[in-house]
UniProtKB/Swiss-Prot annotation:
The lineage of its organism: Eukaryota, Metazoa, Chordata, Craniata, Vertebrata. This is Serine/threonine-protein kinase ULK4. Residues 363-373, 384-393 have a biased composition (Polar residues). Keywords: ATP-binding, Kinase, Nucleotide-binding, Repeat, Serine/threonine-protein kinase, Transferase. May be involved in the remodeling of cytoskeletal components, such as alpha-tubulin, and in this way regulates neurite branching and elongation, as well as cell motility. It catalyses: L-seryl-[protein] + ATP = O-phospho-L-seryl-[protein] + ADP + H(+); L-threonyl-[protein] + ATP = O-phospho-L-threonyl-[protein] + ADP + H(+). HEAT repeats lie at residues 727-765, 842-880, 926-964, 1025-1063, 1151-1189, 1213-1253.
């Protein structure tokens, strides 16, 4: 099963997501729709209708899958978005463009109708654009076969999925709402209840053409009933472009629309008239004219026939069926009919249940999108995001200007979590209040519950209010009367907690009476309880009428607090009520958006609250005052502006720093945060008074909620430039922010990313510090946590938005960093003594190179930053490094030798990281060959051993990658060009240096030889270059020097290279033999085989086996070559040519030492690896054919036992035959071997079992061979 890589999300619906994707192992991009399984009927319908359709104006279906949680639909990727998006962006399209788009629509729909398919729900969001502007029909969820009942089909699929047909009627009823499309484009007859038809689809096309030209559909209304009435009764207005400067509609276009938008389907244009219409300017002149309904039916019948038949017979069959009165919808072929839904199943039903992990999430970050994907009516809006058009635009696609970036950032400064409002009154975090209780026995009025009060009739409500007011207004002549009044007030506290009751009581005469008693009641207990009732009413009321005397209450409460300011208990009673009233006025004013003069209250209220904040007050009073400011400043109102003073920031900061209760500390900093939302100078005043270091220390040591508010404060201040230069230069501040990325709180991490983004926008150098502090690691961690396709909680969604902006900025910043580095190097290029300005520039820019390394080693950034532009810049930097290394340019004096070496090392390391991911270089092969490899080749000549080795390693590995990569369609020519450039580079520059490179200490020869291996394996012509460069003797010298470490990298490369050279048909074998190829192979094979046969030495066994196979491959090529020469000599012997015979004899003489390997090859035959047996047996066969039984140890007792074991254990007749032929050749060419066989009892028994008449099945070739050998030994 092949997996898919998912890239960015390009569309989303309530139950579906569309991703841009790629099949793993290919470069073919597709659109992948992931949908909930509840959408199975729609998706199944899409698949069964389109699975075999191939048309340029219809989105191609590829395949579909079912995993444990989702259905996955893989279709053609359209890169131009939807027609709806185009219309929305351009508002209206010129008539020429409408014609071009219309031709695509007509072509696609005509093809569908010829197949008997009705699209049914044609709308702009279901029409997608391919790159060059071709329109394609997509989303066939609601399409159907003509004459079919789609509700029944949906119910059938759903019932099948449910495991039976129980409740089928219920299913059909539930499907009615699912088969309805967009009413805006629905034909009048369908609105009346008729079935969809060819004619209704043509009406929808007319609506589309109208909307493309005018920018709006012919009929539109927010009200469904009004829209229906317009479609059924009104004629569309003439199409007029939104842009008045555009030309009016032509008479042809108007006539076409009139024909398509006829309410009577009988008068509507048919296919024949539509295709011949003059508006198309004969675009369909060569089209198939079988476009009437009858012709469409004939076309379907033709398609339904399963075998090759004469066209006349098909026509006769069609006519005979028509004569019998069959309707087109009754002649559905197997192509579309789905009476048994199991006929179409996603792949999981055939291949076992699949895991969601078959669709792998790319490391690439996922952009958030507001578009949706349609898989059912009213749910989705299809959208496909553009693909990259060229490598150079990979980064710039979706590039944000700094203005747009900061605009999006400002929207993220404050979240709902930062602006949560909690009650001021009865807030347990401020002060725990005793529970409110009342005694219904002494209430003297009905103790209605809240539910009862809500349903009182007006008269009963008025009576109830009158009773309440009467009791409150009664005089307190005795203690009993006071208790009764307090009891009533407690009852009011209970019912005031309900919003609707509180709203009615606040706007009743009771509220004025409560204010009066708050002023005149002689008993402070009653005053306190009255204040509490007022506060609860203000806290729970939902609206405020302008004639309600809230300002009077605020003034009164202010006076009472001011007159009794030293009475802390009284303040604790009155402050919450004052705060709730002020907050009520502020919220209502914010709703109404205009300040109300009737709600203006005196400055004394602000003064009193500010005094309550000051040092020396009880913490409860401080807390209440801070809470009031926190709530009021959440609103944008005149009341909030009253708290903005020069001292408010430091006062709240003092409360935060000197309070021990976390709840008060949180309230104080939250209030400061909300004031800063109105005026950033409030936090600026704090920093100026207490110092930035003190604020940073507080941020580092605070609890999570405080850290969230403080990060918001810093973000708000940075967004408006306050203390900007100081903050972006403060390394301790940046380090503290990065440490907060370890917080468990999603909001804190998101805000930390946002603060860092502000810093990086204005100080690029801080990106280096951030990377060194593991910023990239934190980004990768949080990118993995945010998985596309899942419903995200608000915290994760917020984190995703902040993270996306930071990633996009860093990706956009990298080219600028590289540009600065290039400029600084270009300015000093060729100079021995840079100027002071140039030195300063080098010191500022070159140390930023580690940023590149951090980004290319990140799975999030690497796919986005490695572009053609990046590789070109990187190659240019390498060219400057070559100049520095050669001494042509001197930067050591400017930045120091250590810094210079570090810069070169990091630059080379960055490319080393990139080549670990070959797919990144696939599209940029020519850029790498033309701009990166040349300076690397030059660095191979460096006097610095480290750079020489590093560059050779990079060169070797890069070349191996490039020559082994495959290219898709259209890339062959570029591949050939880059291959020729690569070959020329190595031939002209690198190979001449090999004479010195191969004699250097390890591991230099290993990398040099690895490059030769890759080139000779990929390009046979390179073999001649190796020979012409006189490298063969050097290669054998390397072999002699490294023979002791046969499993080392150098020897592995040597053997691989020799294998390529010997296997090449154009290779000069004479040269290889002259340099001692035979003796080297004998020695290497002997040593390697000994390692493989040593049962006690299991270390490096796999490596030795791989090496042995390569050596046997070389031996086989040598013997095959020799055998060919000998065969050629024997063929020419009759002609009397002595040269060929002499050459064959000389070659046989050269190869004679190889016969010593026979006694080594035989023990290798029982090897567990079948490939070892295969090549060993072939080598042994050719050796005995060429030299017979020359090796005296060929049939030693040990080897005889091996042959006996093999003939017994091997069941393949071909293998048995080969072994028997080897034995026969040995005994017929050497008497000694014949005598050895006579005494080999086990081998003779094995031969007897293979001979005819042994009682077992005998192969027609194997048995005679076994019999022949037995007869030779006299058995």
């Amino acid at each position: 099963m092949e997996n898919f890589i998912l890239y960015e999300e390009i569309g989303r619906g309530s139950k579906s997501v569309v991703y841009k994707g790629r099949r793993k192992g290919t470069i073919n991009f597709v659109a992948i729709l992931c949908t909930d399984k509840c959408k199975r009927p729609e998706i199944t319908n899409w698949v069964r209708l389109t699975h075999e359709i191939k048309h340029k104006n219809i989105v191609t279906f590829h395949e579909w899958y079912e995993t444990s949680n989702h259905l996955w639909l893989v279709v053609e990727l359209c890169t131009g978005g939807s027609l709806k998006t185009v219309i929305a962006q351009d508002e209206n399209l010129p008539e020429d463009v409408v014609r071009e788009f219309g031709i695509d629509l007509i072509s696609g729909l005509h093809h569908l109708h010829k197949l008997g398919i009705l699209f049914c729900d044609i709308s702009p969001r279901k029409i997608l654009l391919e790159g060059p502007g071709t329109l394609k029909f997509s989303n066939f969820c609601l399409a159907k076969v003509e004459g079919e009942n789609l509700e029944e089909f949906f119910a059938l699929v759903a019932a099948e999925e449910g495991g039976g047909d129980s409740g089928e009627n219920v299913l059909k009823k539930s499907m009615k709402s699912r088969v309805k499309g967009s009413p805006v484009y629905t034909a009048p007859e369908v609105v009346r209840g008729a079935e969809f038809s060819i004619s209704s689809d043509l009406w929808s096309v007319g609506c589309l053409l109208y909307e493309m030209f005018s920018g709006k559909p012919p009929f539109f209304s927010e009200s469904i009933s009004e829209l229906t009435e317009k479609i059924l009764c009104e004629d569309p207005l003439p199409p007029i472009p939104k842009d008045s400067s555009c030309p009016k509609a032509s008479s042809d276009f108007t006539n076409l629309l009139d024909g398509l938008l006829q309410r009577d389907p009988q008068k509507r244009l048919t296919w024949t008239r539509l295709l011949q219409h003059s508006f198309w300017k004969k675009a369909f002149a060569g089209a198939d004219q079988e476009s009437s309904v009858e012709d469409l039916s004939l076309s379907r019948n033709t398609m339904e026939c399963s075998g090759p038949q004469d066209s006349k017979e098909l026509l006769q069959n069609s006519q005979s069926r028509q004569a019998k009165g069959h309707k087109s919808g009754q002649r559905l072929g197997h192509y579309f009919r789905l009476e048994n839904p199991t006929e179409f199943r996603p792949k999981s039903t055939l291949e076992g249940q699949l895991n969601e992990s078959m669709f792998l999430l790319s490391s690439r970050p996922t952009p958030r999108t507001s578009t949706a994907v349609e898989v059912s009516p009213g749910e989705d809006r299809t959208h496909c995001s553009p693909q990259k058009t060229s490598p150079l635009t990979k980064i710039t696609s979706g590039r944000l200007s700094q203005q747009d970036l900061e605009s999006q950032m400002r929207e993220l400064i404050y979240t709902d979590s930062d602006l949560v409002v909690t009650p001021i009154i009865d807030n347990p975090k401020i002060m725990k209040q005793p529970p409110v209780k009342f005694d219904p026995k002494i209430l003297h009025l009905p103790a209605y519950s809240v539910d009862k009060l809500l349903f009182l009739k007006d008269q009963d409500w008025n009576d109830f209010l009158q009773q309440v007011c009467s009791q409150i207004d009664s005089t307190e002549k005795s203690m009993g009367a006071s208790r009764a009044k307090l009891n009533l007030l407690c009852y009011l506290c209970m019912v005031a907690g309900h919003q609707e009751v509180a709203t009615r009581l606040l706007h009743s005469p009771l509220f004025k009476l409560l204010i009066q008693h708050l002023r005149i009641a002689p008993n402070w207990d009653i005053r306190a309880k009255v204040a509490r009732v007022i506060g609860l009413l203000a806290s729970h009321t939902t609206e405020l009428q302008e004639n309600t005397p809230v300002v009077e209450a605020i003034v009164l409460l202010t006076e009472l607090i001011r007159e009794n300011f030293r009475n802390s208990k009284l303040k604790q009673c009155l402050l919450p009520t004052l705060g709730e009233l002020i907050y009520l006025v502020a919220t209502q004013e914010e709703k109404k958006k205009n300040p109300r003069e009737c709600w203006a209250f005196p400055l004394a209220a602000y003064t009193v609250l500010m005094r309550c904040l000051r040092e020396g007050e009880e913490r409860v009073v401080n807390h209440m005052a801070a809470k009031i400011i926190e709530n009021v400043c959440t609103t944008f109102s005149a009341q909030a502006q009253g708290f903005i003073t020069g001292e408010i920031g430091p006062i709240l900061w003092y409360l935060f720093r000197h309070s021990t209760a976390d709840s008060l500390r949180i309230t104080a900093v939250s209030a400061l945060c909300r004031i800063t939302r109105h005026s950033p100078t409030a936090f600026q005043n704090v920093i100026e008074k207490v110092g930035l270091n003190s604020v940073i220390n507080s941020l580092a040591s605070a609890i999570c909620k405080v850290q969230q508010y403080m990060l918001t404060l810093f973000t708000a201040m940075l967004s408006c430039g306050v203390h900007l230069q100081r903050l972006i230069q403060e390394k301790d501040f940046v380090s503290t922010i990065i440490r907060l990325l370890e917080s468990p709180s999603t909001y804190i991490r998101a805000k930390a990313f946002l603060v860092l983004l502000y810093i990086l926008i204005y100080n690029r150098e801080m990106l280096l510090l951030s990377c060194q502090a593991r910023l990239v690691m934190y980004i990768e961690r949080d990118s993995r946590k945010i998985t596309p396709g899942k419903e995200q909680q608000s915290g994760n969604e917020y984190l995703s938005k902040c993270l996306d902006l930071l990633i996009r900025h860093i990706v956009q910043e990298l080219p600028r960093i590289l540009g600065d580095i290039l400029n600084s190097l270009a300015n000093v290029s060729g100079r021995k003594h840079p100027s002071t300005v140039q030195v300063k520039q080098l010191k500022m820019c070159l140390p930023l190179m580690p940023i590149v390394l951090h980004l290319v080693t990140s799975q999030v950034f690497r796919p986005q930053v490695v572009t053609e532009e990046f590789l070109f810049s990187y190659g240019t930097i390498l060219s400057h490094i070559k100049s520095v290394d050669s001494g042509e340019t001197n930067i050591d004096g400017a930045i120091g030798l250590t810094a210079s070496e570090e810069f070169i090392k990091i630059t080379l390391s960055a490319f080393e990281a990139i080549i670990q991911y070959p797919i990144l270089l696939k599209d940029y092969r020519s850029t790498v060959v033309d701009y990166i490899l040349p300076p690397l080749v030059s660095l191979v000549q460096s006097q610095n051993v480290e750079w020489r080795l590093f560059s050779l390693r990079l060169l070797s590995e890069t070349t191996s990658l490039l020559v082994n990569q495959e290219f898709g369609d259209g890339k062959e020519k570029a591949s050939v060009d880059s291959d020729s450039n690569l070959l020329a580079l190595i031939r002209d520059v690198l190979l001449p240096q090999y004479e010195h490179i191969l004699v250097e200490p390890d591991p230099v020869p290993a990398y040099a030889l690895k490059l030769l291996v890759a080139m000779t394996e990929h390009n046979p012509t390179f073999t001649r270059l190796v020979e012409e460069s006189k490298l063969i003797p050097l290669i054998f010298e390397v072999t002699l020097e490294h023979q002791e470490s046969i499993l080392g990298n150098t020897m592995q490369s040597v053997i691989a290279l020799l294998n390529n050279l010997v296997a090449c048909k154009d290779s000069n074998m004479k040269l290889l033999y002259e340099q001692g190829l035979v003796s080297h192979i004998c020695n290497l094979l002997t040593e390697t085989a000994t390692l493989c046969l040593d049962v006690d030495n299991k270390n490096n066994n796999e490596m030795a086996a791989a090496l042995l196979f390569s050596l046997l491959d070389i031996l086989h090529s040598m013997l095959t070559y020799t055998s060919g020469i000998v065969r050629l000599a024997l063929q020419t012997q009759k002609s009397g040519s002595g040269e060929d015979i002499q050459a064959a004899e000389d070659l046989l003489l050269l190869n004679r030492p190889l016969t010593d390997l026979i006694s080594l090859l035989i023990p290798l035959l029982p090897n567990e690896d079948p490939e070892i047996f295969d090549v060993s047996s072939k080598c042994l066969s050719i050796l005995v054919q060429l030299y017979g039984g020359e090796n005296p140890d060929s049939l030693s007792p040990e080897n005889v036992e091996i042959f006996a074991h093999l003939l017994t254990s091997k069941e393949d007749p071909k293998e048995q035959k080969l072994l028997l032929r080897i034995l026969r050749r040995m005994i017929t060419s050497n008497e000694k071997h014949l005598e050895s066989l006579k005494n080999a009892g086990s081998l003779l028994r094995a031969l007897e079992r293979l001979a005819p008449g042994s009682g077992s099945f005998a192969d027609s070739v194997v048995a005679p061979l076994a019999l022949e050998i037995l007869q030779a030994v006299g058995r």
